[in-house]
Amino acid sequence: MRKTHINVIGAGLAGSEAAYQIAKRGIPVKLYEMRGLKQTPQHKTDKFAELVCSNSLRGAAITNAVGLLKEEMRRLDSVIIKAAEYTQVPAGGALAVDREGFSDFVTKEVSNHPLVEVIREEITEIPQDELTIIATGPLTSDNLANKIREFNGADGFYFYDAAAPIIDANSINFDKVYKKSRYDKGEADYINCPMTKEEFQAFQEALISAEEAPLNSFEDLKVFEGCMPIEEMAKRGYKTMLFGPMKPVGLEYPDEYKGPRDGEFRTPYAVVQLRQDNASASLYNIVGFQTHLKWGEQKRVFQMIPGLENAEFVRYGVMHRNSYMDSPNLLKQTFQSRKQENLFFAGQMTGVEGYVESAASGLVAGINAAKLFNDEEVVIFPKITAIGSLPYYITHTDSKHFQPMNVTFGIVEELDGPRIRDKKERYTKVAERSLNTLTDIISKENLA
């Protein structure tokens, strides 16, 4: 195996993180990205780490599993977390970013590193005799996807992913909405569009009957629960949306609210939330409203939302096919291929789900590719850490029932001793144990 550099194929969240981790360890990187020459159906730019779905990296507190994962990544000097914090926009207890500023930051930070050579080229073959990380994401080009399937000897799996619409803030009718974060956590960062029972019923019926865009595939529609299209939720039952993205709890009317309401109830029957999408607050996305409706139908139905009667859509919601590997049979916990030690895979194609999780897989793959380059022992992060629980889960779960997975405390190893009943106290203890363990690993393995 030639060891003059490490190849990273794909400059998304995982690939950008992997390239950064390798370069900071003094190893030359060839970072291949086809966007700029050839686009995917979902990407709009040629920038690194483009966020094609939401602009939220989810919960920030370490008593939330993804918040703990972010803190672990911060301590491992993640460029993705650094970019997110630099381009953060208000979002209550969540970490949301200005999506363009975020991609700009990652692009500059990675491409300006003296050891990173960016090559705008489509890779159609898997390198055999060089250390390589493939992080081409769920929208891998057909040519390379076919080679990966051929290499793995399996068709792999797929699911459909969806993105929510983005609207112009100037087109919102602020007489019918109010600003508030759920349970008043943090600042009043969300715009809330309240619905009466009658308005909700009409909205649900319109969603159910709205015309969907055709799928570019003969396969059945399979969707990841975390990105369930809003129209699919509406079809699942009357209360599905009320316990999902339109949940009203913690979003009581402010005293000054003068719009329509059901009698004297303090809380709306349903609420649609809008989250700031860029630093200047000129754009907002409709939280949890991933959709596959035709664009004309999106405009018709979503303008039924109070305050959005004249909404101008900067981007309509879209759905795309995501592919992922049979990781339980194909990958090690280090994200190495079981078939070829010098080949790593990272990102959503491995079956981790979510922006933060994808970047975390790139971080682990990058660290271990660098270890292999230097003839050192690879690092297996223990499953008592969030960053170790994900690779353990995707490589040890039952292959027959394997589906994309977000980080949750359910996959982090339980605490020893009697179970602590109070969730916040229990998760605080889990987080403390995880961070203490990670501190020891960083010191022992010289990962800082």
UniProtKB/Swiss-Prot annotation:
MF GO annotations: flavin adenine dinucleotide binding; tRNA (uracil(54)-C5)-methyltransferase activity, 5,10-methylenetetrahydrofolate-dependent
InterPro entries: FAD/NAD-bd_sf, MnmG-rel, MnmG-rel_CS, MnmG_N, TrmFO
Lineage: Bacteria, Bacillati, Bacillota, Bacilli, Lactobacillales
Entry-linked PROSITE patterns: GIDA_2
Residues reported to bind FAD: 10-15
Function statement: Catalyzes the folate-dependent formation of 5-methyl-uridine at position 54 (M-5-U54) in all tRNAs.
Top-level taxon in the UniProt lineage: Bacteria
Catalytic reaction list: uridine(54) in tRNA + (6R)-5,10-methylene-5,6,7,8-tetrahydrofolate + NADH + H(+) = 5-methyluridine(54) in tRNA + (6S)-5,6,7,8-tetrahydrofolate + NAD(+); uridine(54) in tRNA + (6R)-5,10-methylene-5,6,7,8-tetrahydrofolate + NADPH + H(+) = 5-methyluridine(54) in tRNA + (6S)-5,6,7,8-tetrahydrofolate + NADP(+)
SUPFAM superfamilies attached to this UniProt entry: FAD/NAD(P)-binding domain (SSF51905)
GO cellular component, one term: cytosol
EC number, as in UniProt: 2.1.1.74
Example GO BP: tRNA wobble uridine modification
Cofactors required: FAD
Listed Gene3D superfamilies: FAD/NAD(P)-binding domain (3.50.50.60)
Cellular compartments annotated: Cytoplasm
Family, similarity comment: Belongs to the MnmG family. TrmFO subfamily.
Keyword check for tRNA processing: yes
Annotated protein name in UniProt: Methylenetetrahydrofolate--tRNA-(uracil-5-)-methyltransferase TrmFO
Keywords on record: Cytoplasm, FAD, Flavoprotein, Methyltransferase, NAD, NADP, Transferase, tRNA processing
